[in-house]
Amino acid sequence: GAVISAVKIVSRTHHEPVAVGRDAVFRPYWQNGKPVLMVLVVGETARAQNFSLGGYPRDTNRDLLPYAGDLFYFANTVSCGTSTAVSLPCMFSAAGRRDFKPGSEVYTENLLDIFARTGYRVLWRENNSGCKNNCNRVETETFCRNYACKDEILLKDFVARANALAGNALIVLHQQGSH
């Protein structure tokens, strides 16, 4: 079962990750000459049906309202699994939900690699159970283990860290959410 699968993954002979998205290029969306800063928040048990950004009638995202014009809300998303170990690597994989093979993230590039290759600085900030091999090749900051701190820790020195990245940047905030 699971032990045999883990041994197969670890014993693979790939030393360099299998490349994906080699033809990807950065095309600026905004024509203002300023660097792009994207922040992607991923986390646990955030029920889309309860987000006012997605049309829920209660005001559940009040603090984000001043920024609503600058946000992209991904409404048509489906999880690849019910565990972080499966859903997180699948989310960043080029394979897609139907073709994703758990364990392939160990030896295959992902979305973060593509961003880095197209000139983005990539930073993964974490207060959850680890990046599940998504952040192996990018800068990573882990704030606590075993759910010992709240999600707001991910904002510690956020502006300074974002400014220090200089140029186009992607910051992933992997929150523990409502564990």
Regions of interest found by a model, annotated:
Residues 1-40, 45-179:
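Active-site-proximal alpha/beta segments of enzymes that process anionic O-linked groups
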